[in-house]
Amino acid sequence: IPNIFNQNEISAEIKKNLLNELNLEFNFEKKLHYKFFPRPHFITNELSIIFNDNKISEIKKIKIYVSLNNLFSLKKMKVKDIIIENGNFNLNKNNYNFFIKLLDSNFKDIKFEILNSNIFYRNLQNEVLFVNNIINANYIYDLNESKNILYSKNKIFNLPYSIELFTDKEKKILNSKINLESLRLQIENQFLDGEEFNSGLSRFNFLNLKSIAEYKSNKNYFEFKLFDEAQNSKFSYNGKLNFRPFHSYLYGSANELNFSHLFSNNAIIKQLLKTEILNNTNVDFELNITANKIKNFDNFTNIFLNSKIQEGLIDLD
C-alpha cells in the first residue's frame, strides 16, 4: 500500500501527474494521507496552486483519487479525480484566465471539482474589486461533443447564477451559457480573443424577450451595443465601462418603456436591490434613456430618464 513509500516520492509523483495531465503546479505544505474507502485516494490540508510562476490560491483541503490497479507502483499510478474544498483564488488582469485555461487540460480520464470556494478579483494594487463564490464547479469531458466543459454554480453580490463554459479551439472562440434564475435571465455568449481587442456576441432571453449585444474590450474599457432581435427593432442601447478610472454609462432609445418588467414582484430591479449590489461603493454608473411613451401611461410621452449611481447612492431624475 502507498504507506510503504517515501512521503517525498509520493508527493513528487502526484505533482508530476497533475502537471502532465492538467498543467497545474501544486505545492503541498502538509503530509499526504492515504485512504482506501470509499475508493483509493490521498488527502491533505493546506496547499496552493502556482500559475504563471505566482501563487494564485490557498486551499484548505484536497482529495486526489488514484487508479486502483497500479497502487503498488508509484511510476504507474494515475490520478483519476480531484476534489478541491474551501479554496481562495486570487485573480487579476494578469491571471484572470486561469479557469478558462483549465479547459485546455486533459479531462478525458480525470474529473476536476471545486467546492465551497471563492474567487477574489483584485486590481494591481491587490485591492479586492469583487468576490465570486463557487458553490460547485466541475470540469468534465463530454464524449458526445468531444470537448471539455465547465459546469459551475456560483454566487456574486448575493446573486446566484450558473454557468456552462467551453471553447472552440479551431475558431478560437470561448462559448458560455449563463442562467440567472432569480432574474429569469439567460445569456448565451461567444467571445473571440483578438490581438488588439476582444470582441463577442451575446444573446439575452429575459421574460421571453430576446435581444442581442455586440461588444468589444481591451485592458482599458468594455463597450457594447444592445438591440432587440425583432425585425423592426424597438430599442437600441449603447454602453461603455471604463476601467481607468472605473466608470460606466448606458445611453439608449426605445419606442416604449415597460416599467412593469422593472418593478413587479419578481422584477429585475427588486432582485438587484435584494442582492445589495447597488450599495457597493465601487459602482459608478450613469444612465440616460429616451423613449416615445410609457406602456399603459398614454399621457406620458417624449420621456427622458436620467439616473446616476455613485458611492452607494442612487440619484434618479
Question: How should each PLM-predicted stretch be described?
Answer:
Residues 87-196, 201-208, 266-315:
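Elongated, acidic membrane-bridging lipid-handling scaffolds
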Residues 3-7, 11, 32-124, 140, ...:
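Flexible beta-edge/linker motif
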Residues 33, 62-65, 127, 166-171, ...:
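A short, sequence-level motif marking secondary-structure junctions
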